[in-house]
């Protein structure tokens, strides 16, 4: 993946974010964040008081009130800046995608075939169902499905990956994306969307996040922050009459400063930025999430359904041996296996043809001259083959061939069953070959488990995440590979229906399930899963069913998606802990200063030894504003993440962000108080 990464504090983004922070001072924007809206109202009130004091309309220190007002406005501006920086990063990423969109003309075909009459029309005039022809050098004008032809396609503008990919009619590699370029040959494409609905348009809309909806956890935390704010607002409002009754009324400026320091402004100011940054980090991993809800769900996942091929194993199974049934020559088995694989373009199919050629010098034959009919593999039949004259050759899984043979009046030999078990015990995949009602033998396919995958699964297990391997292999093969890879469970001989049933079973137990998929047959399971990562190379149906799209089409990315989701949740939790701990420490600065005249006994709480009530209040307000600035990089980048158990993670965060949140204000407020005192500003 070669997409350009943005610096954490890109200068151009910082400049734009500063302007946006000022624009966000509008009350129409501020009211969306109740905590910061209270600060905004307090800033406005103290500003009016400072003006009135300066004009002589009110008694009091105009200088002190103005200083408090300025830093309250800075508090609002810094919170706005944090959100604007996160949004700016997303918009910059969206702008890079907008550069992919180009105004172009399309060759619209009057009939769905290569040699049909062509009309040249603007690409934006194409509608769902229109058929277009694209040739080498052309930009694909719309999202669609290839209905004829095959071509090499450069998708680097979308995926960031420079290596071209093959797109062809039929199968799971027929989906194309508008904005990509044809490098060779030609394609006939049926458009699957209307203008403005393309994958690229949806990517841009998702990345810009202008209408980003709050996630459930974010809403719950916002409600908690509002509740705390209301409690402190009521508490502060009741203080004035008590102090007035005692004869030493606390000024409105001090009460506003007290309220702002009591309410959780730190997390209140950073909450939106954390959510936007989470989606931005997901894009940094070349994964497009449809919403923050999807990213958050990834952090809560506790079951991962992982495809064996390409995720757990290297995915390039190769034919390693022909094992004939009793009474069958190995050459006869090899000949039938090669015939059944002549039109099979999968790596496994090509390896069978090559092995037959190497062992017995069997050459490929022309299917057209043989008047043969190829029978393609489907997820339902789980076998493929060829019909030549009176010969009906099939290869496939053990159960599929068993049903096929018995349906044709034959029986499955016991010696082949034993061979199947032996091959499976060795971790290889047995493919059974049959001609008509007769079983000819087995093809042994070997795959290799990826290095380091067992350790990654052990880390996931520590975090309380269950890993389940999904494979079309039989149970013995699946069990051998599962044991070697270290997964917790497996689903063998998987069908789309079995995957869907498994997801529903886990969800009925209260678990959150994540999975990947790329084919149309994966769409029902993707739609059911809580986190569904569709491969960009997959079909349109799969991409529409998922709530994330992996531009690299790498099934292993699911583990990284979960890590990013957990990092977002950890960042939010850590900064919430830090914010609340911060507030506790600030009480020791501002409460003695605010009420020392009313209740002299509160002076014993001035454990920091702050110079004066004015310097204490101003120091607390300044610290309250500056801490938001210092935490912006952490909110954008996320806290450091380690794969630990929930209890270990909680202990670690309480030590770092809980204790840190208590200590930092003591140091920071005392340092600011010393600077104010030494400079003579108070």
From Swiss-Prot:
Active-site residue list: 307
Annotated membrane topology: Multi-pass membrane protein
Name of this chain's protein: Potassium-transporting ATPase ATP-binding subunit
Entry's Gene Ontology cellular component terms: plasma membrane
Complex formation: The system is composed of three essential subunits: KdpA, KdpB and KdpC.
Presence of the UniProt keyword Nucleotide-binding in the record: yes
Originating organism: Klebsiella pneumoniae (strain 342)
Binding-site residues, ATP: 344, 348, 377-384, 395
HAMAP family, alphabetized: KdpB
GO molecular function, one term: P-type potassium transmembrane transporter activity
Top-level taxon of the source organism: Bacteria
Keywords of this entry: ATP-binding, Cell inner membrane, Cell membrane, Ion transport, Magnesium, Membrane, Metal-binding, Nucleotide-binding, Phosphoprotein, Potassium, Potassium transport, Translocase, Transmembrane, Transmembrane helix, Transport
Task performed by this protein: Part of the high-affinity ATP-driven potassium transport (or Kdp) system, which catalyzes the hydrolysis of ATP coupled with the electrogenic transport of potassium into the cytoplasm. This subunit is responsible for energy coupling to the transport system and for the release of the potassium ions to the cytoplasm.
EC numbers for this chain: 7.2.2.6
Catalyses which reaction(s): K(+)(out) + ATP + H2O = K(+)(in) + ADP + phosphate + H(+)
Residue numbers binding Mg(2+): 518, 522
PANTHER family in UniProt: POTASSIUM-TRANSPORTING ATPASE ATP-BINDING SUBUNIT (PTHR43743:SF1)
Gene: kdpB
Entry's family note: Belongs to the cation transport ATPase (P-type) (TC 3.A.3) family. Type IA subfamily.
Compartment(s): Cell inner membrane
UniProt xrefs under Gene3D superfamilies: Calcium-transporting ATPase, cytoplasmic domain N, Calcium-transporting ATPase, cytoplasmic transduction domain A, HAD superfamily/HAD-like
């Amino acid at each position: 993946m070669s997409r350009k990464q943005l610096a954490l504090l890109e200068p151009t983004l910082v400049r734009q974010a500063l302007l946006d922070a000022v624009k966000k001072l509008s009350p129409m924007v501020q009211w969306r964040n109740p905590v910061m809206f209270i600060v905004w109202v307090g800033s406005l009130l103290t500003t009016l008081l400072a003006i009135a004091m300066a004009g002589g309309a009110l008694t009091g220190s105009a200088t002190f009130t103005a200083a408090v007002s300025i830093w309250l406005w800075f508090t609002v501006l810094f919170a706005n800046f944090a959100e604007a920086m996160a949004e700016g990063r997303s918009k910059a990423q969206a702008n890079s995608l907008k550069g992919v969109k180009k105004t172009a003309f399309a060759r619209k075909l009057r009939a769905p075939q290569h040699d049909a009459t062509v009309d040249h029309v603007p690409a934006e005039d194409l509608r769902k169902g229109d058929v277009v022809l694209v040739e080498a050098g052309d930009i694909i004008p719309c999202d669609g499905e290839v209905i004829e032809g095959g071509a090499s396609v450069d998708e680097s503008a979308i995926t960031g990956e420079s290596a071209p990919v093959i797109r062809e009619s039929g199968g799971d590699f027929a989906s194309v994306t508008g904005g990509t370029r044809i490098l060779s040959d030609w394609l006939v494409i049926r458009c699957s969307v209307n203008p403005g609905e393309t994958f690229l348009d949806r990517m841009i809309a998702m990345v810009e996040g202008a209408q980003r909806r709050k996630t459930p956890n974010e809403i719950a935390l916002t409600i908690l922050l509002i509740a705390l704010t209301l409690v402190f607002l009521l508490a502060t409002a009741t203080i004035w009459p008590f102090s007035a009754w005692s004869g030493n009324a606390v000024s409105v400026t001090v009460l506003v400063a007290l309220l702002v320091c009591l309410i959780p402004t730190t997390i209140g100011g950073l909450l939106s930025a954390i959510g936007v940054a989470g989606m931005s980090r997901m894009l940094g991993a070349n994964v497009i999430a449809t919403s923050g809800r999807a990213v958050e769900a990834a952090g809560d996942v506790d079951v991962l359904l992982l495809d064996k091929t390409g995720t757990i194993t290297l995915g390039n199974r190769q034919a390693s041996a022909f094992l004939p049934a009793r009474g069958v020559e190995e050459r006869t088995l090899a000949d039938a296996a090669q015939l059944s694989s002549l039109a099979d373009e999968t790596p496994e199919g090509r390896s069978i043809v090559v092995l037959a050629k190497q062992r017995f010098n069997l050459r490929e034959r022309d299917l057209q001259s043989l008047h043969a009919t190829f029978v393609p593999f489907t997820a339902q039949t789980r076998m493929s083959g060829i019909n030549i004259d009176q010969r009906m050759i099939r290869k496939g899984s053990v159960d599929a061939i068993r049903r096929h043979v018995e349906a044709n009046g034959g029986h499955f030999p016991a010696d082949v069953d034993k061979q199947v078990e032996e091959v499976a015990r060795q971790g290889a995949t047995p493919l059974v070959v049959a001609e008509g009602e007769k079983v000819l033998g087995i093809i042994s396919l070997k795959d290799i488990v990826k290095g380091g995958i067992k350790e990654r699964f052990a880390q996931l297990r520590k975090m309380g995440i269950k890993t389940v391997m999904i494979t079309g292999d039989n149970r013995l093969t699946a069990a051998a590979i599962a044991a070697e890879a270290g997964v917790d469970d497996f689903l063998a001989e998987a069908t789309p229906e079995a995957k869907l049933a498994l997801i529903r079973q886990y969800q009925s137990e209260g678990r959150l399930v994540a999975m990947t998929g790329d084919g149309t047959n994966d769409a029902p399971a993707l739609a059911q899963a809580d986190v569904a990562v569709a491969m960009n190379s997959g079909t349109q149906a799969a991409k529409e069913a998922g709530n994330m799209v992996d531009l690299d089409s790498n099934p292993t990315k699911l583990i990284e998606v979960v890590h990013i989701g957990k990092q977002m949740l950890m960042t939010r939790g850590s900064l919430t802990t830090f914010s609340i701990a911060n507030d506790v420490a600030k009480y020791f600065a501002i409460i003695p200063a605010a009420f020392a005249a009313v209740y002299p006994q509160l002076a014993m709480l001035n454990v920091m030894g702050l110079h004066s009530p004015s310097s204490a209040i101003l120091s607390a307000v300044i610290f309250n504003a500056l801490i938001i600035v210092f935490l912006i990089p952490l909110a954008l980048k996320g806290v450091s993440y380690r794969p630990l158990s929930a209890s270990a993670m909680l202990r670690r965060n309480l030590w770092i962000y809980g204790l840190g949140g208590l200590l930092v204000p003591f140091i920071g407020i005392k340092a600011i108080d010393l600077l104010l005192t030494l400079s003579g500003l108070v």
